[in-house]
From Swiss-Prot:
Primary residence: nucleus
Alphabetized CDD domains for the sequence: homeodomain
Biased composition (Basic and acidic residues): 1064-1078
Organism classification: Eukaryota, Amoebozoa, Evosea, Eumycetozoa, Dictyostelia
Protein name: Homeobox protein 13
Polar residues: compositionally biased ranges: 73-96, 148-158, 379-393, 794-818, 857-883, 1081-1095, 1297-1316
Function in brief: Putative transcription factor.
DNA-binding feature ranges: 1198-1261
Origin species: Dictyostelium discoideum
Composition skew (Low complexity), residue ranges: 132-147, 159-177, 315-326, 348-378, 394-408, 415-426, 641-693, 709-731, 770-793, 889-911, 1001-1031, 1045-1063, 1096-1116, 1123-1137, 1166-1177, 1275-1294, 1317-1334
Gene name as annotated: hbx13
Record's compositionally biased regions (Basic residues): 327-339
Length: 1363
């Protein structure tokens, strides 16, 4: 085997080595091939180089031949009777591109078709040396693109370095015949520089014989003048590339179409213009006295110029062209002091001197291109030359030349009153600015000649351009249901500048309403397009170039993950799609209100001061009322019907329209106040709309008729869309309003039947007193309108689309009367129960009478509940959170209410510690019914029901922002506007001895404003009477309880807001049902009624704490009384005085699952104590937030939103908890997934709720075990004590009652169990363990036997379970 292995290894090694060798060979072959290819490429390159060298040699030979020919041509054409004029460049020959110093994109071939030239030519003019040919000049590009040739230089002013004696032959300018034979000398030395520049311009390989041959075709001076005239027209480049046609003058050969095709950047022609321009520049730069031998007669001391009919062809002025490298040609022309005097020809062919017609300068400021020229040529056309006629030219330089000076001022003919005299046409937009914006306003010669004129003009033009913003025409909105187009931006956008998060949210909100079938929207196609359409409306800032990047960064920023949700690219394969996690109405909600903390606190102080001055006047009642008319439907002000889009600056008209619609229902003295407030509201709306129009990017130019027409069409379309949306909105509102009325009527039908009798009795008793109070309240209301309305009329908008008012629970009828909104576009309806239909004239009075200044100030015709607001708003929170205590209200009304209670109150020693409700209609002390308290409790019940419906509707709410958490701390108000309350649980039924029933509803609201009154906690043991002489230690007990309660109340101030939100909205309602009804006419539906034969003068009832919003009903009997206005717990003690002269107190918790303590009283009425446990913060009815992490620290900048559990959700969770998680704490995966899908909860949230629920069960079991040990310990120590009324002395053990339907009957007349609440002082940071307490049981005997309290202080650390 080893041998086989060795053979295998050798074979494998050999195989591998062969593979390696093959690879190496292949690599070598490839390298060889590459080397061969490289060698071939090198050979090819060498061949190419050789060919190029040969070509260069051939070109050099050709150039030498051409030079030789050029040297021979002047000698061959040397004739004494002919003169040679400087000719234009090659017109029919092509010029190679590589031989020109100027880069040309195109080459044009020009033809000259005319008669042959008969003028004499001199051979000695163009004799050149080779040295002059090879000489180079550095000014290759400086003097190339001038505008016009001017042969003007006087010999008297010229300083020539070389002087030559020239004799020219005079020829007839018309016939071209030679007049005399004149011998000329060579002028080659004068023209050497000119010829060298000419060759450098036109190329070295040009045959100059062609020039001479071409010039032979020009027959006379007229054609020469035509050629020169064409050179002054830079636009004379036609479609056919012909300079001179066979027939007709030159000015008639070029149409306007040919001028329009003039290209400034591709002016690559080699025409007569360039040649003559070179000649003119050469003459001016080198100061030559003569350019070429002229066929004309030479005037003394002047350069001869060609003439046609006695008119000079060329004007007399010099061009000092300073061409910079940047192509900025600033030509400052200085006139010669001496003019050229040239006149018409006489009979002897001599000219008489005449002055020039015009004196003008060339102001050429060519900024961008070299093709911008001034058309200052005197000649209008060769055949039409008049002294009084200006030239005709056309300029098509629109964008490249800002200085097209076409208006030239003549010395002899300068009429400012005739603007049409100069027929120049300028297509540039700056022409009007250049001429001062008015026709005929031209500048003087001195301004044109000023060296600073062009700079000033350029500066003015640049300033005008910088001041004009770029015209951005927004795209019209294409969405049918657009909230922004219909209603404008939300109200919070006007209180503070909106952030980009707010802008993105409102954009996604409107997109969601317009396209509800789509969940995610693309950032560029949808979101940015929507923002672009409404940028000036919602952004309220300047449009920048990077605002789209800002939107992208905002949507993807981690700070706004709870607002915006990005679609997963893994699921659908798409990127850049965003949506909203939770949708709320930004026209109602306060989340977008980002005012500073200082401003909000200042507003709070102002509101509190007004409330103190006005005596708790409801802010809604002071707002102007509006009657039903055509412009209003269900209390909504349609402010967008004022056509503010069409009125740019007409705010007064809009105000008048709104005032007419808003002031129809103003009664008494409120008309002036309402008018002022409506003006404020309407001005705010209309100013915003007008700003949107004035800041629109469309610039209204007086001549832009198309833009104005387009804008008017857009406005008309928007107006039509708004009308259609308004009609649809009204129809939907009407339908929904009817549906809500039907539903609410069915829900409240039974409840109304129970309240009718109470309302009627209350009306009969307080009708007279209410009429007196109404007159006083009307005066207060009129005096306070200005103060209240000034803070709440700043924002008034119309309702958003597809969002309707969440009306509160109404009783019977909901009138279409409405109140002006505080900060939302909705005007909330008032829940009024009217008996008659005519309420137009009575509503205002009813609103005034519905103030809460006293318990008795209720509407005379019907039971009225407070107007409830359906949506959270900043001003609403101010209103609700700053209500004064109910105790303060009652204290202020005691003076007026004591007059009616004098007949019923028999005891003058009654002590009212804080506040007591009124006692009325109780005669003789027997069968007394507290009517005022009864009716008050009914009102509070209705208010709580309204709060339930109110808070259930506010489900989809934006998460908390940074500043929202400060509102709750500032107002010290525990009701959270984001909470969704849980409906009432099943009430527990207990049998309490015989014929004694109390149907009590506890409104245990926590009020931080009552902390000063907490020292007088439910300590009703401080009753000193003659019957208490047997209890020596009673006072000591009371002192001990007072100390504990004071400590507890002082220590609970830190955690009032976070811990006590559990006790609200009827979650902790305890109702007692009985087998027999009361004998009173109200039946068992009236709460807080005790029907006894005789009430003990010392009997007390443990009352619920009164809150700022829902004051609980409180009542007392004839004896001395003391109320508890402190912060009590959910469990309450019910006091019942039986016929058998024995009393029992049963304490139950809010859920009804267990009985905490039982207290029984004997018939001696010696000692009374209440049982009020403050340890129900751990009950099941609390929200589903986890116990520790649910409420974060106050220092946390980002507090989590409180999540609450609805009743239907709690049912699912309880079922799952009882079946799976209660015993072993384990889950069922399938059931857990099903539960998560049904509730739309995440698994982590369900886990937190279950853990919190299990922790509460542990705490409850521990509490029950402690109470059990305390109760048995008390019974064992008091086993020898018996009662005279009961044979049994055993106490039944307290077992937790987990079933709500179970009934227990407990009767222990032999013992008196009095519980003393010893609340532990918990100053820990744990917010959920604030009010835990341990029960202290005191056994009190009957008759005269003194007893000592048995204190069982079990210091069990319950906090360890939560930690």
């Amino acid at each position: 085997m080893e041998y086989l292995k060795l053979c295998f290894y050798l074979f494998f090694f050999y195989f591998v080595m062969e593979q390696i060798q093959q690879q190496q060979q292949q690599q070598q072959q490839q390298q060889q091939q590459q080397q061969q290819q490289q060698q071939q490429q090198q050979q090819q390159q060498q061949q190419q180089l050789q060919q190029q060298q040969q070509q260069q040699q051939q070109q050099q030979q050709q150039q030498q031949q051409q030079q030789q020919q050029q040297q021979q041509n002047p000698k061959m054409n040397n004739q004494p009777n002919e003169t040679r004029l400087p000719s234009p460049p090659l017109l029919n020959s092509t010029v190679p591109k590589n031989e020109l110093n100027i880069n040309h994109h195109h080459q044009h071939n020009y033809k000259i078709n005319s008669a042959p030239l008969k003028a004499s030519q001199h051979a000695n003019e163009y004799d050149h040396n080779e040295e002059s040919l090879n000489s180079s000049n550095n000014n290759n590009n400086n003097n190339f693109n001038n505008s016009r040739p001017t042969f003007s230089s006087c010999s008297g002013n010229s300083n020539n370095t070389t002087t030559t004696t020239t004799t020219t032959t005079t020829t007839n300018p018309i016939n071209g015949s030679v007049n005399s034979n004149v011998t000329t000398t060579s002028i080659n030395t004068i023209h050497q520089k000119f010829i060298t520049q000419l060759k450098q311009r036109l190329g070295k390989g040009i045959d100059y014989n062609n020039y001479i041959n071409k010039l032979k075709n020009i027959n006379n001076i007229n054609n020469i003048s035509k050629l020169i005239n064409l050179s002054s027209q830079p636009d004379a480049i036609g479609k056919n590339n012909n300079l001179i046609s066979n027939t007709g003058p030159v000015a008639e050969m070029y149409d306007d179409e040919e001028f329009d095709e003039f290209d400034e950047e591709e002016d690559d022609d080699i025409s007569a213009q360039k040649l003559v321009g070179i000649l003119s520049r050469e003459s001016s730069s080198s100061n030559l006295s003569s350019i070429a031998p002229s066929p004309l007669l030479q005037q003394p001391n002047c350069l001869p110029s060609p003439f046609i009919n006695g008119t000079p062809l060329l004007s007399n002025h010099s061009n000092n062209n300073n061409n910079n490298n940047n192509n900025h040609h600033h030509h400052h022309h200085h006139h010669h002091q001496k003019r050229l005097s040239i006149g018409s020809m006489d009979s002897t062919n001599h000219l008489t001197p005449l002055p020039l017609l015009h004196k003008h300068t060339n102001n050429n400021n060519n900024i961008n291109n070299n093709n911008n020229h001034n058309h200052n040529n005197i000649l209008g056309s060769p055949n039409q030359l008049n002294r009084s006629q200006d030239f005709t030219s056309k300029n098509n330089n629109i964008n490249n030349n800002n200085n097209n000076n076409n208006k030239i001022i003549n010395e002899e003919n300068c009429n400012k009153g005739s603007p049409n005299q100069n027929s120049s046409e300028n297509n540039s937009e700056e022409e009007n600015e250049y001429h001062g914006g008015e026709e005929g306003n031209v500048y003087s010669v001195y301004d044109l000649n000023s060296p600073y004129f062009n700079e000033r003009k350029q500066r003015a033009l640049s300033n005008n351009k910088s001041q004009q913003p770029p015209q951005h025409v927004p795209t019209p909105c294409t969405y049918n249901d657009c909230c922004i187009c219909a209603y404008g931006p939300p109200p919070s956008f006007f209180t503070s500048a909106p952030t980009w998060a707010d802008i993105c949210y409102i954009a996604l909100y409107c997109l969601t309403l317009s396209r509800p079938e789509v969940k995610y929207y693309h950032i560029k196609k949808d979101i940015c397009t929507f923002i672009d359409c409404h940028y000036e409306t919602i952004c309220m800032r300047k449009r920048t170039s990077i605002w789209r990047q800002t939107v992208n960064m905002t949507l993807s920023h981690p700070q706004y993950f709870e607002m915006f949700q990005q679609e997963s690219a893994l699921e659908n394969g798409r990127k850049g799609y965003y949506g909203l996690k939770q949708i709320h109405d930004p026209y109602e909600h306060t989340a977008l209100n980002k005012r500073s903390r200082r401003k909000r606190r200042h507003e709070q102080k102002m509101i509190q001061e007004e409330l103190k001055k006005n005596g708790f006047t409801n802010l809604l009642l002071n707002s102007p009322s509006i009657e039903n008319n055509d412009q209003h439907h269900n209390g909504y002000i349609q402010s967008y019907n004022n056509n503010s889009n069409h009125n740019n600056n007409n705010n007064n008209n809009n105000n008048n329209n709104n005032n007419n619609s808003n002031n129809n229902n103003n009664n008494n003295n409120n008309n002036s106040n309402n008018n002022n407030n409506n003006n404020i509201n309407n001005n705010n709306i209309n100013n915003n709309n007008n700003n949107n129009i004035l800041t629109s990017p469309i610039q209204h130019h007086p001549h832009s008729h198309q833009q104005q027409h387009h804008q008017q069409q857009l406005q008309h379309q928007q107006h039509q869309q708004q009308q259609l949306l308004h009609q649809q909105h009204q129809q939907l509102l009407h339908q929904q309003h009817q549906q809500q009325l039907q539903i609410q009527y069915q829900q409240q039908q039974t409840h109304n039947n129970n309240l009718n009798q109470t309302q009627q009795l209350y009306y009969n008793h307080h009708h007279h007193q209410q009429q007196q109070q109404q007159q006083q309240q009307q005066q207060q209301h009129n005096n306070n309108n200005n103060n209240n309305n000034s803070n709440h009329n700043s924002v008034l908008t119309s309702p958003p689309l597809s969002q309707f008012p969440k009306t509160p629970l109404q009783l019977s009828q909901t009138p279409q009367h409405s109140l002006s909104a505080l900060s939302s576009p909705f005007l909330k309806t008032l829940t009024i129960e009217d008996e008659d239909d005519s309420y137009n004239g009575q509503v205002h009075k009813k609103l005034r009478s519905a103030k809460l200044t006293s318990v008795n100030s209720i509407n005379s015709n019907s039971g009225m509940s407070l107007p409830m607001i359906s949506s959270p708003s900043p001003n609403l929170s101010h209103m609700q959170k700053n209500r004064p205590n109910f105790d303060d209200i009652l204290n202020s009304s005691l003076s007026s209410s004591n007059t009616t209670n004098s007949a019923t109150t028999s005891s003058s020693n009654s002590i009212l510690s804080n506040s007591l409700s009124n006692i009325s209609n109780s005669s003789g002390g027997s069968g007394g019914v507290c009517i005022s308290e009864d009716y008050e409790s009914n009102i509070q019940r209705r208010k709580s029901l309204n709060n339930i419906v109110l808070n259930k509707t506010n489900k989809n709410i934006l998460p908390k922002l940074d500043d929202e958490c400060d509102d709750e701390d500032d107002f010290h108000f525990t009701e959270n506007e984001r909470e969704v309350p849980v409906s009432n649980l099943k009430s527990s039924s207990f049998i309490i001895n015989k014929n004694n029933i109390i149907n009590q509803q506890n409104y245990n609201e926590n009020n931080n404003n009552n902390n000063n009154n907490n020292n007088n906690n439910y300590n009703i043991n401080n009753i000193n009477n003659n019957n208490n002489n047997n209890f020596d230690d009673a006072d000591d007990e009371n002192e001990f309880e007072n100390k504990d309660n004071i400590n507890n109340n002082n220590n609970n101030n830190n955690n009032n807001n976070n811990n006590n939100n559990n006790n609200k909205n009827d979650k902790n309602e305890s109702e007692f049902e009985s087998k027999e009804k009361l004998n009173s006419p109200f039946g068992s539906s009236i709460p807080n009624i005790v029907n006894n034969e005789q009430l003990s003068p010392y009997s007390q009832q443990s009352l619920s704490s009164s809150s700022s919003e829902n004051p609980s009903p409180q009542w007392s009997t004839n004896g001395p009384s003391q109320t508890s206005s402190s912060k009590l717990s959910n469990s309450t003690s019910t006091l019942i005085n039986n016929n058998n002269n024995s009393m029992s107190i049963m304490s139950i918790n809010s859920s009804g699952n267990s009985i905490n303590n039982t207290t029984t009283y004997n018939n001696n009425n010696n000692f009374i104590n209440n049982n009020s446990n403050n340890n129900n913060n751990m009950e099941i009815d609390d929200d589903d937030e986890d116990g520790i992490d649910g409420i974060e620290g106050e220092d946390d900048s980002k507090k989590r939103m409180r999540k609450t559990t609805r009743p239907d959700e709690k049912i699912y969770l309880e079922i799952y908890y009882q079946h799976f998680y209660e015993n072993n704490g384990k889950h069922s995966k399938d059931e857990l997934i099903t539960l998560s899908n049904n509730l739309n909860w995440k698994v982590n949230r369900i886990q937190r709720w279950l853990d919190n629920r299990r922790t509460k069960d542990k705490l409850k079991n521990l509490r029950v075990s402690q109470e059990r040990t305390i109760s048995f310990g008390a019974s064992s120590t008091s086993s020898t004590q018996t009662s005279t009324n009961s044979p049994s002395s055993q106490l039944s053990p307290l077992v937790p009652n987990m079933n709500n339907n179970d009934q227990q009957s407990i009767s222990t007349p032999s013992l008196i169990l009095s519980q003393i609440n010893n609340n532990q002082n918990n100053n820990q940071n744990n917010n959920n363990n604030n009010n835990t307490n341990n029960a202290d049981v005191t056994l009190i005997s009957n008759n005269n036997v003194p007893n000592t309290p048995i204190m069982a202080n079990t210091q069990s650390n319950i906090n360890s379970l939560l930690n």
